Amino acid sequence: MAGLGPSDFKVYEDGVPQQLKFFSVDPFPISAAIVVDTDLPAGTMKKVNETLPALVGAFTEFDEVALYRYGHTVQQISGFTGATGLSTASLNRIKRTGREGGPPVAGGPFGGPSINGHSVNDPNAGGQGDVPTAPKESYVLNDAILLAARDLGRRDKTRRRIIFVISDGREQGSNAGYDEVKRILLANDISIYAVGVDTAAIPIYDQANRIRVPGFGTGNILPRYVSDTAGDMMAEFDRQGIEQAYAKITDTARNQYTIGYTTQATKSSAFRSVDVRVLRPNLKVYAKEGYYPLPPSTQK
């Protein structure tokens, strides 16, 4: 909503009212780490590949971007560079064909020919008591966001720092846990923006994906990251919708009310809650619920 001024806002840190020292409605240049899930199903991956030029086009000449991809591992494709100077070669390096079908089937009626319950192609078929299991899949979303956040934390503080994730949101096999990643994000004032694709774009499947099944990882955790960092997420299924989401999300990230206050210096790294209120009726506020102070030696 446009037209709000400093007097329309009240900010509380740990319940204590704060005096605003900074207020702006001007658009901010963006530092964006673009994180792409390249282990999506082949059909979805094809759509994402085709939309990558539109993603780059959603940024301005004042923005900078870095590219990352992940599946069972994380890889930085390019470091931070001006968005308009991002090379075609870098975009091509992020493209993948995606996975075909579902996870491998190692047993049951669809597991191929067997003798006494053992695959005829199994060199250990003569063994006793072995239980066929499917190879464990991994989708290291937490690790990907953590790597991007650490790199992004070193960028200029005067820029708006965001991680732009394109994924179905599944998490399995990361070394980093959710709470660890969240702490790094909040300590470095980084917001997560996301385009949910594939099952994350289908409401009934998306709801099921948010349930954790022991041994199978977590489904769509992107909404948690988005909510905890005051970002935004759009779920799109077709190519045109994905491309439109890119433009809407970057516009949202760039154009926000920016308010600031001077907090009390302390050596403590404990979480500090922040409550932002707008003194007008029927408005919903999107703001981070708090932050973790950086150690004095790392603050710039």
Across the structure, where does each feature detected by a protein language model lie?
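Scaffold/interface architecture of coatomer-like assemblies
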Residues: 1-300
